[in-house]
């Protein structure tokens, strides 16, 4: 039975940051675990399934190369570029991951800002990183466009890191919708005087 331990879709910029080799363009990183025989079978099965779907290059990373690639994937927000302007997390349905990544890359390209996009494709969580060097207005514009396209897909977007000047233009938290009223009531019960970090949480709570 094919049971991948990881299923990450990465764009070309992320692929270069991970130094996994292969042709330019997007890549699907698939983690498999088990005894050597299980791992070999799963790798062969993955290739058998994906070849008819357009797979053009398949390679197995093991040992230090594998560990380095997954470490770099985990540190993408800090390591994709020499300088990072902002990191945003998107949450969408898994079936929409590829589309929103493509739209997000196009938005960054229009603004002239390099971007690295990577997703835990099986659960619909996308990490979007903007390279530093851009002016505040351009960074804020891209983050705003990203949030709009994620919302259009029925998802939510969170600004994980950005300079204060950008956060003053783009809310860190997305609109929580009707749930905000419930959270406000809970907050008022737990902190009636409004002393605990007022305005720091979603919806200005």
Language-model features: locations:
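Conserved glycine-rich FAD pyrophosphate-binding loop
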Residues: 10-12, 21-23, 47-205
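Acidic, glycine-rich loop-and-beta core segments that form the ion-binding/anion-interacting portion
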Residues: 1-57
């Amino acid at each position: 039975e094919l049971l991948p331990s990881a299923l990450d879709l990465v764009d070309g910029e992320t692929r270069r940051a991970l130094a996994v080799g292969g042709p330019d363009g997007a890549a699907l990183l698939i983690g498999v675990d088990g005894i050597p025989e299980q791992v070999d079978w799963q790798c062969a099965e993955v290739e058998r399934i994906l070849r008819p779907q357009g797979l053009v290059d398949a390679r197995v990373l093991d040992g230090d190369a594998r560990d380095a690639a997954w470490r770099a994937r985990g540190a993408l927000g800090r390591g994709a570029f020499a300088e990072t302007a902002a990191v945003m997390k998107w949450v969408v349905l898994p079936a929409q991951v590829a589309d929103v990544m493509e739209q997000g890359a196009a938005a960054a390209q229009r603004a002239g800002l390099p971007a690295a996009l990577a997703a835990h494709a099986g659960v619909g969580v996308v990490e979007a990183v903007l390279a530093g060097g851009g002016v505040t207005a351009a960074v804020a514009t891209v983050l705003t466009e990203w949030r709009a396209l994620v919302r259009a897909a029925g998802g939510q977007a969170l600004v994980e890191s950005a300079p204060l000047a950008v956060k003053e233009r783009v809310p860190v938290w997305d609109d929580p919708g009707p749930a905000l009223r419930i959270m406000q009531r809970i907050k008022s019960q737990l902190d009636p005087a409004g002393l605990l970090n007022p305005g720091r949480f979603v919806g200005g709570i």
